Amino acid sequence: MVIGLFFLKAVPSYSADKNPAGVTGFTYSITFPDNQVKKDLGYFKLKMDPGKNQQISITLSNPGTEKVTIDVKLNGAKTNQNGVIEYGESTIKNDPSLQFDFTDIVTGPESVELAPGETKNLDLTIQMPETSFDGVIAGGIQLMRANQNGTSSNEGGSKIINQYAYVIGVVLQESEKVIAPDLKLNSVKAGQSNYRNAIFVNYSNVMAAYLDNMTVEVQITEKGKETVLYERKQTAMRMAPNSFIDFPVSMNGERMVAGDYVANILVTSGDKKWKWTKDFSISDKDANKFNERDVGLVQEKGLDWKLIALIVVGILALIILIFVIIRIRNKKKQEKELALKKERKKKKQQGSSNGKSSKKKD
């Protein structure tokens, strides 16, 4: 059974300050404070002062006839491997360039209970850093009904439980000053994406600014050779402030081979361009490990020709053994029948001889 979490977003790429109860069992509306930069965004974008403490509110309503418990989680903005910004809960770690963590700055209750027909405010506290900064701090407020049964579906023989949550974006800034994003290459290494062999290009947006309309082009070659083994181009990607991306380049279902390689990487966004050439190696240990885990290769290994050959040889050996046993038995049977015939013939000859002797005596 697989549990999938779907986010119904109100973040810097989507706006919705009111919503139907739908599958979540509750509704919310945003109460914008005076320092909201724009009140038609559907998410919080606040201009703050260093060290300022402020409370923001989200109005929660339960239109149903049963009590609803809403789990509240606060998450810093991250970038997933598809170049999509995640404001909901994720396993992606913080980038080392992150100076101020959203979850240290924004705090609030872990859950809210609503009786049938009740409306209540979810109050969150923002404590801005004492040190001033340029750029933005970004994150999300995740609202999810506790003990959610979700909707189920069957795909590929597996039961999938779909659960739903609202995610409301929060962007904090101290000025209107626009800073440019900047990228730093961290590593290129072998790994797996969705249990299939891949090469991962890991790089960071080290500035407190969004990077939009990003295009990534990667080509992988064997060191000292020009033939492109694997390549990928992806457009219309984004990066969160002070976040990294693990960009996978598929090995197209091929076995991973140990050796020395070169990654040629080009990232563009508008008139900005970053270009890197990075040598990397794949060890025998890693190649064997990932090949054993690659689901495509495991399925191919279902036709294990060595095993099939052993089975065929075993069957042939069994057939030969049975044939030899039958031949031996038939030979023994024939020898026995031949011996009986000889014995009968001998007795018949002896009987004839005895008859002739009797006639002579008479």
What is each model feature region?
Residues 30-64, 68, 111, 182-194:
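Beta-sheet-dominated interaction scaffolds and their linkers
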Residues 66-93, 127-176, 255-294:
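Terminal connector regions
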Residues 1-15, 309-327:
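Sec-dependent N-terminal signal peptides of Gram-positive bacterial secreted proteins and lipoproteins
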Residues 40-41, 50-57, 119-122, 134-140, ...:
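Short, solvent-exposed loop/turn segments enriched in Ser/Thr/Gly
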Residues 18-26, 30-34, 75-119:
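A surface-exposed loop-and-adjacent beta-strand signature within N-terminal beta-sandwich domains
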